[in-house]
Amino acid sequence: DAFSSLRAHLETAYWEEAVALLTEEDLAHLRALVAAASEKLSQPRIQIPFQEHRELHLTIFRRLDNPFVVGILGAYWDAYEAVELNTFADLGYLQAVWRYHERIVAAICAGEYAEGKRLLIEHMQLLSARGAPMELPAGANGAVPALRV
C-alpha cells in the first residue's frame, strides 16, 4: 500500500533527527504507553491498544520541526483506524507488536538509536506479514525492497 510505504519511509528517514529531540518527559510517556498496552493485553477481556500504538509512534516524531511529516504521520494513523487495521488480528500478533515497541523504547532510552531504527523496521514487517503489504526501507545502501506477503 502506497500510504504505508510513505509512512515507513518517513519514519525511517526522520528517525535519527526525531529521537534526538525527545525529552525525558517524552521518554517517560513512551514507557507509560508500553506499560498501558501491556496491561490491556494481559486483561481477561483483552483490549486492543490502538490509541497507545498511535500515540507511541506519533510521540517519537512530534518534536520534529516539520508540520508536513507530523501531519502525514497523523493522517496515516487516521487511515489505519478507518480501514480497521486497529481491529483484533490475534493475540500473538498484538503481543509481538508490543514486544517490539518495548524494545524500541528501551533502545531509544539507552541512546541506542541505530538499534531502535533496526527494530522499527523489523516491527513494520509484522504489518506486512499480517497481510497489509508495504515497502520498507532497507539498509544504508538506500535500496528499498517491496515486501509482499
Predicted regions and their residues:
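Conserved amphipathic alpha-helical segments that form helical-bundle/coiled-coil interaction surfaces
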Residues: F3-N86, A96-A106, E115-L126
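Solvent-exposed loop and edge beta-strand segments that line ligand/cofactor-binding
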Residues: A89-Y93
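Phosphate-/nucleic-acid-contacting segments
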Residues: E112
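Short arginine-rich
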Residues: Q125-M134
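Short linear motifs at protein or domain termini
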Residues: D1-T12, E16, A20, P133-V149
